[in-house]
Regions:
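Unchanged
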Residues: 1-190
Length: 190
């Protein structure tokens, strides 16, 4: 996430910019290893009016009596940080990866999440068989996730072909890869 891009920006600025452009103004950036330059960049870059409820705050890994170790991955980072997130009212929690380049309309994803009555939504991107072992791959049935496998071996991929639409199938993109973008209903987290 601290990787410089285009001179003065960092990779983490992409998901933060996506949030700000979607009207999402309350964000936590969870950091752990070798994060001093990233923490400094966030602190020096994102300033909001004193009258605004908007913020971009760093939640660095911390050792507590309940969690004496470092984060053991993204899910654990979120789990250990929930006590900092809980006081902020919201019906939904958007969880993003800080190291991807994309532009996304989160409002559209949230609308789909609500329309399906989902508890959790995962943004996916169709990928080709040669790319699939680099991602978490999921199967779905009418918009509902039925199975998930993290970085599958090529030998099992034939069982993970999904309906990705005619255009993607024609391009050889038969697998749904997780983009590391999730919406959770708040009541699942607390």
């Amino acid at each position: 996430p601290a990787v410089p891009i285009a001179g003065k920006y960092r990779l983490v600025d992409i998901p933060i910019s996506n949030c700000l452009n979607n009207g999402i103004g309350r964000m936590f950036v969870l950091t752990q290893f070798n994060s001093a330059s990233l923490n400094r960049h966030i602190k020096n870059t994102y300033h909001f009016s004193a009258f605004s409820k908007a913020f971009v705050d760093i939640l660095a890994a911390e050792q507590t009596p309940d969690s004496p170790g470092w984060f053991q991955g993204t899910a654990d980072a979120v789990r250990q940080s929930l006590r900092h997130i809980e006081p902020f009212e919201s019906d939904y929690i958007l969880i993003l990866s800080g190291d991807q380049l994309y532009q996304m309309d989160f409002a559209n994803m949230l609308d789909n999440h609500k329309a399906l009555g989902a508890d959790i939504s995962v943004a996916t991107i169709p990928v080709a068989q040669r790319e699939a072992p680099e991602f978490g791959i999921l199967k779905s049935d009418e918009g509902l996730i039925t199975s998930f496998i993290e970085k599958p071996k090529k030998e099992v991929l034939q069982d993970w072909v999904s309906d990705t639409g005619e255009e993607m199938k024609a391009a050889g993109r038969d697998y749904l890869a997780s983009m590391g973008i999730y919406i959770f209903n708040r009541n699942l987290m607390f």
